[in-house]
From Swiss-Prot:
Free-text domain note: Comprises of two domains. The C-terminal domain contains the binding site for glutamine and catalyzes the hydrolysis of this substrate to glutamate and ammonia. The N-terminal domain is anticipated to bind ATP and cobyrinate and catalyzes the ultimate synthesis of the diamide product. The ammonia produced via the glutaminase domain is probably translocated to the adjacent domain via a molecular tunnel, where it reacts with an activated intermediate.
Pfam families: CbiA, GATase_3
GATase cobBQ-type domain boundaries: 237-428
Protein origin, superkingdom: Archaea
UniProt miscellaneous comment: The a and c carboxylates of cobyrinate are activated for nucleophilic attack via formation of a phosphorylated intermediate by ATP. CbiA catalyzes first the amidation of the c-carboxylate, and then that of the a-carboxylate.
This protein's record includes keyword Ligase: yes
Protein source organism: Haloarcula marismortui (strain ATCC 43049 / DSM 3752 / JCM 8966 / VKM B-1809)
EC number of this enzyme: 6.3.5.11
Protein's name in the database: Cobyrinate a,c-diamide synthase
Active-site positions on this chain: C317 (nucleophile)
Transmembrane segments: none
Increases nucleophilicity of active site Cys (site feature) positions: H420
Organism lineage: Archaea, Methanobacteriati, Methanobacteriota, Stenosarchaea group, Halobacteria
């Protein structure tokens, strides 16, 4: 599958809208696009999936490793892959959009805010193209997609100012319908506030989609890793919370779980009973927006009983919050949670951690064997007040974790981390492979 990267000059330049317009242009032209996102984000991919009904691939060399990132890419489907970048093209060094483009050998199309410039837009693009050589990054900046650019003289001025080796791939017109509302943690999820399809189709008309398709190329393939235990998926069942409170799930995680087990979704917000399963996974999301439903629905109480019975439970970020004793919102409302892990969670007005992280296991748990390392990402607005009997699974090699030095609160065969892990990280292998009595 061939593809290209839509990279921005900075955060806030309009990469997500440009990506959605490009995906729309591909569909309108008869292609089946595969969306992807550079970096660890959950929210932008939700907009990709809401638009084209295809899960967006998470491409991050820190989370998955170089080979894991390539495997993640090649598990995609469709005619052509559109990779939305993260922040500005070169921001983030080892985890930058440039690092993803280099690791996959994909051409880069630069999204430049052209609202108040013409020749300066070309100068910006030229500088970004030449900067790759300056820092020794092997990427091709193929051209630009002009964001917030009018037609006529404005578009012509940008096109004419570009050097011959930088292609003008079109523009995204300034339109009030192409704005996505945001909140803490970023934009609203795609299922909540997707852009109007007609507005995207209008924007897509000013993109030279065939020229973009001609620019795309395929990354080098990599051998797949066969990790099945030999048991059929039907032999094991994993209950996975999936609703508006638990919506931060990398597709690679579900793929990893499905490779070894039958995945049984359930909704704690709706008060669903927990499916009969060998393990339970609570991903991140927005439990703070659903405190009353989680407190009264009964699902968390049922999870607490399963945890006390020794069923392995793995919670990430929002999952950690749900497994705690209580959750207090920024409005001061406090809700009882599952009460499995000895912590009280309180939401803060600003983020408490944002970074790629690395953890080293202190002991055997459902997430790792002793001494193993796990890489992931943390981004949260909550803080934990710990009980005196708090026990941790991981020491922090990089990042903040729960208390600045540790992550992974444990009790029974349950673990709750602020760290989000990719399906290629190895974090879910032990959850699937080891019976609870052996942990």
């Amino acid at each position: 599958m061939e593809g290209f990267v839509l990279a921005g000059t900075s955060s806030g330049v309009g990469k997500t809208v440009a990506t959605l317009a490009t995906l729309t242009a591909l569909e309108d032209a008869g292609y089946q696009p595969q969306p992807a996102k550079a970096g660890p984000d959950f929210i932008d991919p939700s907009h990709h999936e809401a638009l084209v009904d295809t899960p967006s691939r998470t491409l991050d060399p820190w989370l998955a490793g170089e080979d894991g990132m390539r495997r993640t890419y090649w598990r995609g489907t469709g005619d052509i892959c559109v990779v939305e970048g993260v922040m500005g093209l070169y921001d983030g060094t080892k985890t930058s959009t440039a690092a993803v483009a280099e690791g996959l050998d994909l051409p880069v199309v630069l999204v430049v805010d052209a609202k108040a410039g013409m020749e300066s837009v070309a100068a910006t693009a030229l500088g970004f193209a030449q900067y790759a050589d300056r820092i020794g990054v092997d990427i091709e900046v193929a051209g630009i997609l002009a964001q917030r650019a009018h037609g006529g003289r404005h578009a012509d001025g940008i096109r004419d100012a570009l050097p011959e080796d930088l292609t003008y791939f079109g523009r995204i017109p300034p339109m009030s319908d192409l704005e996505i509302p945001d909140r803490h943690l970023g934009l609203h999820m795609g299922s909540e506030a997707g852009l109007d399809r007609d507005a995207l189709s209008t924007a897509a008309e000013t993109i030279d989609i065939e020229r973009l398709v001609e620019t795309a190329r395929a990354p080098p393939e990599v051998a797949t890793t066969e990790r099945n235990t030999g048991d059929s998926p039907a032999d094991r069942r994993v209950a996975v919370a999936q609703d508006s409170a638990f919506c931060f799930i990398y597709p690679s995680v579900l793929e990893r779980l499905r490779s070894e087990a039958s995945v049984e979704p359930f909704s704690p917000v709706a008060g669903d009973s927990v499916p009969d399963a060998d393990a339970i996974y609570l991903p991140g999301g927005y439990p703070e927006l659903h405190g009353e439903s989680l407190e009264t629905g009964g699902t968390l109480d049922e999870i607490a009983v399963r945890a006390a019975d020794g069923v392995p439970v793995y919670g990430e970020c929002g999952g950690l919050m749900a497994l705690s004793e209580s959750l207090t919102t920024t409005d001061g409302d406090t809700y009882e949670m599952a009460g499995v892990l000895p912590a009280d969670i309180e939401m803060q007005d600003r983020y408490q951690a944002l970074d790629h992280v690395e953890l080293e296991a202190r002991a055997d748990t459902v997430a790792a064997t002793s001494g193993a390392h796990r890489r992931g990402h943390e981004f949260h607005y909550s803080a934990a007040t710990l009980g005196s009997d708090a026990s941790f699974a991981f020491d922090m090699v990089r990042g903040d974790g729960i208390d600045g030095e540790h992550d992974g609160l444990t009790e029974y065969s349950t673990i709750g981390t602020y760290c989000h892990c990719h399906g290629e990280s190895g974090a879910f292998d032990r959850l699937l492979a080891v019976p609870s009595k052996d942990i």
